[in-house]
């Protein structure tokens, strides 16, 4: 049976699963691990087809969620960044009994722009898919650079993300294309409106992929959820502002436990 790569660490009583974004792997969390391990038992996974979980091919959002659940703790707080936020949200919808709380980071229930809904223009995602087949390493690097654009530490943060990707074998083009398909087609807005779990949404003020307008729109549509827009950060707030980010996660876990 194929197995995902998992790394479990930490001294806390509360299980926290961290799901990375498109093109990356669990190494992306290294700048917050030391801040979180005193409070949590961390479960760091390479999503199917990424990092050290290379035996898997492209798959749908629901398929990815089911595979991740197979080796996950029975109940945990789930934190998903970017595409990982969609996976965590899908798990909260399909298996709410496994979820103590949901945190999405620089994520959107619908990444693609529609009428009166801010997001990535469909032609931009289509362009990335086309470029993947021509020069996939350069395309991944361009996508990573977009994630840190505008922050004071943009170049340093982009180098860090690139180093995380290059730590391991690059994902197959089919896996990367499948991930972009998820970003292009997923729309969980209506389903998540009925989610009654403790739910925190974290955004970066300077994020060029998930506009901060999404936070305000969902505040009115999902009044049962909390949101924080982190000033000075872009698409990877845990990289640019690890201390403030980690504190948000710890505070949310404590609230969810009361």
Curated annotation (Swiss-Prot):
Active site (catalytic residues): 82 (nucleophile), 207, 235
GO CC annotations on file: cytoplasm
Pathway assigned in UniProt: Cofactor biosynthesis; biotin biosynthesis
Swiss-Prot/TrEMBL catalytic activity: 6-carboxyhexanoyl-[ACP] methyl ester + H2O = 6-carboxyhexanoyl-[ACP] + methanol + H(+)
Keyword Hydrolase on entry: yes
Residue ranges of every copy of the AB hydrolase-1 domain listed in the record: 16-241
Principal localisation: cytoplasm
Binding site for substrate: 22, 82-83, 143-147, 235
One Pfam family here: Abhydrolase_1
Location in the cell: Cytoplasm
Keyword Cytoplasm: yes
Gene Ontology BP terms: biotin biosynthetic process
InterPro entries found in the cross-reference section: AB_hydrolase_1, AB_hydrolase_fold, BioH, Carboxylesterase_BioH
Keyword terms, alphabetized: Biotin biosynthesis, Cytoplasm, Hydrolase, Serine esterase
Assigned EC number: 3.1.1.85
SUPFAM superfamilies given in the database record: alpha/beta-Hydrolases
Subunit structure: Monomer.
NCBIfam families on file: bioH
Family: Belongs to the AB hydrolase superfamily. Carboxylesterase BioH family.
Task of the protein: The physiological role of BioH is to remove the methyl group introduced by BioC when the pimeloyl moiety is complete. It allows to synthesize pimeloyl-ACP via the fatty acid synthetic pathway through the hydrolysis of the ester bonds of pimeloyl-ACP esters.
Listed name of the protein: Pimeloyl-[acyl-carrier protein] methyl ester esterase
């Amino acid at each position: 049976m194929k197995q995902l790569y998992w790394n479990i660490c930490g001294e806390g009583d509360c299980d926290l699963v961290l799901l990375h974004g498109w093109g990356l792997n669990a190494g992306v969390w290294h700048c917050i691990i030391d801040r979180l391990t005193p409070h949590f038992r961390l479960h760091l996974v390479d999503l199917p087809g990424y990092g050290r979980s290379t035996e898997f091919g492209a798959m749908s959002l629901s398929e990815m969620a089911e595979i991740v659940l197979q080796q996950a703790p029975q109940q945990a707080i789930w934190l998903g960044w970017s595409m990982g936020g969609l996976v965590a949200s899908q798990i909260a919808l399909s298996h709410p009994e496994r979820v103590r709380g949901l945190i999405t980071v620089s994520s959107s229930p619908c990444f693609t722009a529609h009428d009166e809904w801010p997001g990535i223009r469909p032609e931009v995602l289509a362009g990335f898919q086309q470029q993947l087949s021509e020069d996939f390493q350069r395309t991944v690097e361009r996508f990573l650079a977009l994630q840190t654009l505008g922050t004071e530490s943009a170049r340093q943060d982009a180098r860090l993300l690139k180093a995380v990707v290059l730590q391991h074998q690059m994902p197959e083009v089919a896996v990367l294309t499948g991930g972009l398909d998820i970003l292009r087609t997923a729309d969980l807005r209506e389903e998540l409106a009925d989610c009654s779990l403790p739910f925190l949404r974290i955004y970066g003020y300077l994020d060029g992929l998930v506009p901060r307008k999404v936070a305000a729109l969902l505040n009115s549509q999902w009044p049962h959820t909390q949101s924080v827009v982190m000033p000075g950060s872009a698409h990877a707030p845990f990289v640019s502002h690890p201390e403030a980010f980690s504190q948000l996660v710890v505070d949310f876990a404590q609230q969810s436990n009361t």
